[in-house]
């Protein structure tokens, strides 16, 4: 599978990586093979593209599905509804409202009558396929160019706190409303993660290795006293 989202216009607004950002991606060690072993995945999506390259594209994830019960709770019934939780991960150039509108139009094109509320009895009799789509507010992506003076200053500061060569990644995934700082405060942001890669983020036994904590303290101290 290529992992490509089939929704019309899903990638139209994407601002691609610059040559400098692509060069940064190809200059660092890639964890793809290690991740396949650790996660037990034979073949990831992307048609051979690197994980960090795929982070330059928006994604559409199915976070959860629910219908009738299974296992010991299974019953001889016909489910009256099926529920799916969808998650949109945006990149620079996307607008969360435009993206959700594209999703709704795509569902309509599959033959569904789309509502943002429960259907009336009359609508249930009129339409064979009904989809209730509830959209929760989101926020857009933000990316600071590697060529920005602040990015260069942070890179220098972080490198000064470590004897090892630091890894510079032009973009990471995460639920961080950084674009609000840029939009309303005209401020520039740079993310400096310190967690270990196997920290089970947002899951059971989420953790931070003590050495990462100590290193992080030194890293943030270097950033706090850097000249910019």
Which functions belong to the PLM regions below?
Residues 1-207, 211, 215:
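Metal-dependent amide/peptide-bond hydrolase catalytic core
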Residues 212-220, 224:
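Extended, hydrophobic alpha-helical segments in both membrane/secreted and soluble proteins
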């Amino acid at each position: 599978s290529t992992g490509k989202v089939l929704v019309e216009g899903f990638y139209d607004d994407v601002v691609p990586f610059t040559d400098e950002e692509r060069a940064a991606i190809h200059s660092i060690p890639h964890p793809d093979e290690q991740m396949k072993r650790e996660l037990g995945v034979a073949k990831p999506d992307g048609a051979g593209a690197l994980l960090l390259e795929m982070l330059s594209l928006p994604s559409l994830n199915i976070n959860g599905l629910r219908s009738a019960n299974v296992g010991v709770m299974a019953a001889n019934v016909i489910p009256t509804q099926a529920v799916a939780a969808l998650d949109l991960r945006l990149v620079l150039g996307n607008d969360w409202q435009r993206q959700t509108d594209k999703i709704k139009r795509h569902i309509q094109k599959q033959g569904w009558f789309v509502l943002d509320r429960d259907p009336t009895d009359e609508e249930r009799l009129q339409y064979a396929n009904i989809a209730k789509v509830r959209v929760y507010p989101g926020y857009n992506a933000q990316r600071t160019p590697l060529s920005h003076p602040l990015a260069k200053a942070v890179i220098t500061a972080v490198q000064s706190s470590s004897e090892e060569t630091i890894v510079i990644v032009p973009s990471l995934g995460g639920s961080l409303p950084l674009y609000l700082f840029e939009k309303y405060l005209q401020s520039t942001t740079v993310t400096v993660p310190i967690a270990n890669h196997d920290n089970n983020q947002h899951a059971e036994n989420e953790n931070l290795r003590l050495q990462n904590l100590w290193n992080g303290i030194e890293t943030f101290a270097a950033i706090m006293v850097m000249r910019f």
